[in-house]
From Swiss-Prot:
Compartments in which it is found: Cytoplasm
Name of the protein in its database record: Elongation factor Ts
Annotated gene: tsf
Pfam family, one: EF_TS
Single GO cellular component term: cytoplasm
Domain of life: Bacteria
Family stated for the protein in its record: Belongs to the EF-Ts family.
Species of provenance: Mycolicibacterium vanbaalenii (strain DSM 7251 / JCM 13017 / BCRC 16820 / KCTC 9966 / NRRL B-24157 / PYR-1) (Mycobacterium vanbaalenii)
Family matches, as SUPFAM superfamilies: Elongation factor Ts (EF-Ts), dimerisation domain, UBA-like
Amino acid sequence: MANYTAADVKRLRELTGAGMLDSKNALVEAEGDFDKAVELLRIKGAKDVGKRAERATAEGLVAAKDGALIELNSETDFVAKNGEFQALADQIVAAAAAAKAADVDALKAVKLGDTTVEQAIADLSAKIGEKLELRRATYFDGTTETYLHKRAADLPPAVGVLVEYTGGDTSAAHAVALQIAALKAKYLTREDVPADIVANERRIAEETARNEGKPEQALSKIVEGRVTGFYKDVVLLDQPAVSDNKKSVKALLDEAGVTVTRFVRFEVGQA
């Protein structure tokens, strides 16, 4: 008896881009363990596995002000374009900056006029007739640079980047914010990547190389090369600079005398 459902197959196909048969086989091999099935498809080379699996379903916007960055979600893009919804987001991010609210729970409790942020969201949700959610919020108290990106001209910003830095000038910091928005770095340095994630990438790289029939004596070099490629995908300082791909982001920052201390990237609909 199958230990997975048709819905599991459909979800796995949507998340990974794999075909129906490959998805079924992965679920069988994983004995119904969904996360294991995703990993098996990665090893076997399914297109875009991992990247598509990060997606979540949501609409809404991101907003930034004076070291604060928030993501406010709606159910539809129709509401995301609503003037009252956008005005509320502006009020919330201003309140976040003023209160230096570093997370969602802290921000929900912040006063907004005669009410709280949490109640203001609930009130507008009841008025519009659609679920609204303050999904993410952060605040950096150092020198910061922000960048907001729209997916379409008639929609509010869907990608927001907040960078905290020291030294240099705003042009270098702005270039880094653009870099993070475009290439989706997750970590600042290699040391910031959790050891279990690196170990898993190394294991997947080795199993993939073996499945490809690579010679045993070459495996170590191949694995290290693929792990280095993984770092270039997810570590900001290791990434090739968008403005000059012959240099790393670290090299360009060193030239500009800028040190990035931390950053965050919010994208509507992204896990």
